[in-house]
């Protein structure tokens, strides 16, 4: 038997052409969305000089994404998934063209930016849900951990590159260039996605979309295993909202403007290391227990983060959180895909992704409230240790998740 390496195995990109096409499309899409993410707030700030108006655009887009995830989950379980993915990407690109044309006007319309933000948020999340539901069919359920780790690396790398490119474009050509290249990138992603095989949903009875969505909710609530995974995911996302305290904590540590960047880079760096060293995760006999313990460790890291006497120690705590949260997230993703019936994959993936979106918003709001009553140090520690207490309770309550065992996949020569 070959020894499995700790390092991430990228062979899936070579052996599975369909996954390679998705990998390429996702990377281009992340870079394109990053260009958009830089341009929209800058344009609104330049037009209105109001941070409230910038925040409103983020809130509207987030709301549209939530609705898109719900609708996308139902569509992915009822219609051919490749068509849903292509339709969502193409429609999203049309919205980017609208933003580009609006930016070229002598007096761009603020209302148009808001409406197109709703449009793009809805259709972007629609395609995400269908793609998640299709992944097991593209790579095989035995390769989901590897696929999830490669995807996580793609997201992290794209998230680092795209803001830098977006900033350079803003400095040289203005927001219209950002929107135009985002539209071009989105339409380019259609080329590799066209090579995907047909991805029909499993046969199931026709029912009203709301009834179908409620069936997904009922399954989530009735399954201690899948429901517990989703709950842990939401709490983990809440913990990541600690970034709203970075500016205040930077003042407390007397950090320079250049040093503050280390705080923002620490969690993505830790997550990237977690993905790169995930080679043995798929071979864990008790993934549920490992998920619970890594989640508890990540909460502890956030609790200790604000208490550190030096900023460099705080950065180490954040990197540790990034690593542990990556381990937990990869286990969540894999177990969710393998333990959810094929007929429910679209809806459950939509609900899981939606609770991640809302968890981040709730966490930011709670930390903002704590910040009004406590010092930044106390707020960060209270959030981390509070989540740690909840996590310990869940460790005791989620018996089925804690005791879950799986037969590790066989290691073949190509995997080593």
Swiss-Prot record:
Family per record: Belongs to the major facilitator superfamily. EntS (TC 2.A.1.38) family.
Cellular component GO terms, alphabetical: plasma membrane
Protein topology in the membrane: Multi-pass membrane protein
Transmembrane region(s): 22-42, 56-76, 84-104, 110-130, 157-177, 179-199, 219-239, 257-277, 288-307, 314-336, 357-377, 379-399
UniProt keyword terms in alphabetical order: Cell inner membrane, Cell membrane, Membrane, Transmembrane, Transmembrane helix, Transport
Ranges facing Cytoplasmic side: 1-21, 77-83, 131-156, 200-218, 278-287, 337-356, 400-416
This protein's name: Enterobactin exporter EntS
Periplasmic topological intervals: 43-55, 105-109, 178, 240-256, 308-313, 378
MF GO annotations: enterobactin transmembrane transporter activity
Keyword Cell division belongs to the record: no
SS bond partners: none
Role noted for this protein: Component of an export pathway for enterobactin.
Subcellular compartments: Cell inner membrane
